[in-house]
Amino acid sequence: MKKTLYILIFLSCSVMANNLPELGDYSSSKISENEEIFIGRQILFQVNQSDSIIRDIEVSGYLDLLGKKLIKASTDPAKKIEFFIVNDSSINAFAMLGGVIGVHSGLFLASNTESELASVISHEIAHINQKHISRFLAQQERASYQSTFLMAVALLLARSNPQLASTTMAGASAGSVQGALDFTRENEKEADRVGIQTLNNAGFDVRGARDFFTTLKKDNQFSGGAAPAFLQTHPITSNRISDI
């Protein structure tokens, strides 16, 4: 079942690639708002075909309400963002191009308070509002189309399945990989900062972010499925805790 969703994520990237402008010059590498909306619709269509999605009305409704509350308190209160829940026990959530956020069921179980859960959702909302994925694609303008596409796929997959990301990254050059990871680490720091502002604006306890990072650090220490340090698209968790 999980494999089905990973394939859908890859197909979502394929949709993205088919609608990307040429990456030859910087100005044409930026994705327009209309293109993002189109991509988001395609992603949701494919997600809705998956049997890995939890469709419980109460849980999904709760996530939607929480998400809307955080969006209203974010840097772009009018932004339309769609949420879905992945039937996966690992602690994770990920933002995708087109205003789509996936949340693993394991995140709900690992969150001790609503503020902890909200801190993760606000972080992903920040990724979307700060246009981190489209900015990444623009930053890769000098890379070959194939390398850029593979990195885009890998970075999305890394948020849901590190092992799959490792395989995909093998198809991209080492230089492009390192440059992209440096870029995404900066994105993570920015998403932390903006996300905490959103959390505070929405009336949640910002200490929830610190508490969740502590939980995440413990999970990484004892989880055999954690990605190697050089493939992590997030800053070292201890550094993120100290930054809060």
Description of each model-found segment:
Residues N18-S160, V177-L181, E190-H234, S238, ...:
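Peri-catalytic and regulatory segments of divalent metal-dependent proteins
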Residues A170-A172, E186-E190:
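Active-site-adjacent, His/Asp/Glu-enriched structural segments that form or flank metal-binding
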Residues T4-C13:
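Sec-dependent N-terminal signal peptides
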Residues S166, G179-T184:
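Aromatic-capped interface at the extracytoplasmic side
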Residues Q163-M169:
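Phosphoinositide system proteins, centered on phosphoinositide phosphatases
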